[in-house]
Amino acid sequence: MSKQTDKTSQIVLSTPLSILSGGGEPICSLATQPSGAIGVIRVSGEKAIEVTDKVFHGVRGKHLTDAKGNTLHYGEILDKEGKTIDDVLVSVFRAPHSYTGENSTEISCHGSAYILNQVVKALIDAGCRQAQPGEYTQRAYMNGKMDLSQAEAVADLIAASNRATHQVALSQLKGHFSSELSLLREQLLKMTSLLELELDFSDHEELEFADRTELKALAETIHQKIKLLTDSFETGKALKKGVPVAIVGKTNVGKSTLLNCLLHEEKAIVSNIHGTTRDVIEDTTEIKGVTFRFIDTAGIRHTDDQIEKLGIERAYQKMDEAAIVLWVIDEQPTAEECTEMQRLAKGKHLIAIFNKIDSKEIERKLLNDELPTVFISAKLKQNITALEEAIYEAADIPEISENSVIITSARHYEALTHADESILRVIEALDFGLSGDLVSEDLRICLHQLADITGGQITPHEVLGNIFKHFCIGK
């Protein structure tokens, strides 16, 4: 067997665990927003139960230090002078059966900001320190309760603003993405071990443990799986930030009225005066659980007004940034106008919207076979449901469940892209019949890139800090 150690199968940290995780010292912080009916304060660390017990007075004198894990206890929290702060319920969790994998307590009390602050102060006086943003989840990662991609999913789950982002974050937190990476890693390790076995017996040129045809087929399978993941990133970005939809057209065709209609609120000023909208107006709304970011733009026309000209320039810019373009018209456009709009919206999903069907006689026909057309009255909110359906279909969002694996992180996308580049070099090397040591090197690079995502190899303190600093305090 190879004498080389597969470093990708180990977790090797460049910074000691005790520094990264605080050595298990007790930390505390609010886990809920203040001023609610109920507030929760989380405590975690090797001595978390002992520290909480110092400020807790249980009924009939019971001590938390004697309590079993996963139990609930009623009593009072006292300040350092022994005065009652509030009646509380304390949940006790013993390692490793807690969120962080450490001994933990959660104190439920009344949600007054004053009470919560006094309880935290009492805990700090008893030996806790204030937790840093994301420190609980960082400790959960360091203690093996979750991998790095799952830890990032916690932040995504908290930030989820619609059904789609919630499902994607939940899938990642449950480990579906990690499972995909684990399968890829197993296949890569199999290839690497066979090639390195050949290197150990390099004196026997007639020996070939790894069939090159089978290796290439496996490498191509890995490439296809990685490509499916990287291709999902565009969908992931759209789900997180909202699918950008530009509303364009001439002045006074009803673009602002349509925006207000889609948003279900009076966001844009509506007027019969040409050129009323001079700047870009943006807002979001949900259609079928997916967030869409609608962008109302200045009416496109020839003008000498310099401010209006700037607005029109921004309209073209926003059209270029959009995934979907809604072309609002209130009369039959010429063939030249259709061609020009299709040119401007090249690479986008373009939908023509005939507005004002309540006040104009319009020949209801498609502009051409390639251009979807919807007939509406934004003023009277007629056929808006049909328009929303057309917008949703244009977004081409796949059916999303809690088992869906969709990439939403730029960090994950970058690592997968580099991994794919490595596996493509493997395929090329096998095509040219290059030696096993060269092929093996690119396989190791691919493994390292995939392991970067889950934190299963060298992970500098700076990388962890950058990830966890975006969490809220209490997570």
Residue ranges and their predicted role:
Residues 308-331:
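Inter-motif core of Ras-like GTPase G domains
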Residues 1-167, 171, 175, 351:
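A glycine-rich (often HGG/GG-containing) alpha/beta subdomain
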Residues 263, 298-299, 323, 330-331, ...:
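Short glycine-/small-residue-rich Rossmann-like dinucleotide-binding loops
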Residues 33-35, 83, 99, 239, ...:
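Conserved catalytic network of the ASCE P-loop NTPase/AAA+ motor domain
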Residues 7-30, 163-286, 303-305, 334-475:
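C-terminal-of-GTPase-core extension/linker across diverse P-loop GTPases
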Residues 294, 328, 353:
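Generic enzyme active-site microenvironment
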Residues 74-86, 90-94, 275-303, 321:
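Switch I (G2) and immediately adjacent beta-strands of P-loop GTPase domains
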